[in-house]
Amino acid sequence: PLLTPWMGRCALVWALLLALCSTPAGAQTRLRAWNVHPEGYPVTEAMKSFAEDVKKSTQGRYQIEVFSNAVLGDQPKAVQMIKGGELDIAEFSMGPLSDVVPGVRVLSLPFLFHDSAHMFRYLDGALGERYAASLKAAGFVVLGWYDGGARSFYCATRKPSSLRDLAGANIRVRSEIFTEMVQLLDAKPIPLAFKDVLEAFEKGSIDCAENNIPSYESTGHYKVAKHVYVTNHVVSPEVLLVSTALWSKLSEPDRAAFQEAGKRSALLMRELWNKRVAQAQEAMGKQGVQFTRVKDVSPFVRRMSPLYAKYMNDPSTREALLTIIANK
């Protein structure tokens, strides 16, 4: 017999009910988040807070597991993983990203920013939005700017107190811009993965490295390199990113939830960072670490002139560099 209108409506209702039953209520999507830092580090703690925020604001539909200590691969590999959609969320310094987004290199220029407050004045505004657009075009969506801290030199075999004390030293570097910086200081750059620095110190294949104080402490580098030359030569950001592959699948409300959680995690990270710097300096002093502050940065700044000239002549970095220098 032919279906009556009433029977047709009943069939439609049953079909809808069956469809609802076949998709479990509150279905979860599990995501992976990566960083290079250890457990308890400000970055890791801020990312865990981000994960909890996302879980709460999406009613548990997105479960994010944070993998610290680069357990899913080193930084260059992780960049390619998130770019290819194999990784969902990650936090990077500018060095590993510079190969795919050359314009971010300017953010690692020596003596560009006075301190973190000066840096975030730009990144929390129009300049940060400009970089976010460049990163999105390369496959990354910015969720928040983290504090990469102020970097200084630390040495095992030398006790530097002036520019000339670094001449001839084997210094670990992480990227091209740091290689150029070290060469301009008449020292020898030694490219090494972050995880290999401690062993290199122990073997004597490097004299010095450079990083921020919390990283110096958390890695145990202070155990073999007890002489810190506080130059604060680079104040640079790190960034929390989500892959465009994931972003394209998110609804507008879920995108808003991720963005708000990212902003909150960035503010938390900066707060945790400032506390960690103070704690690390105090702890290192008790471990016999010697801190020598640079008396005059002008000799260092003058040495960097060729580096600034190079980036001023590069179309991908000129505009951002001019924006920052004009307002220093």
Stretches with model-predicted labels:
Residues 28-118, 126-127, 133-328:
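N-terminal secretory/targeting leader peptides
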Residues 9-22:
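Bacterial N-terminal signal peptides
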Residues 23-27:
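Sec/Tat signal peptide C-region and signal peptidase I cleavage site
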Residues 1-8:
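N-terminal secretory signal peptides that target proteins for export/translocation
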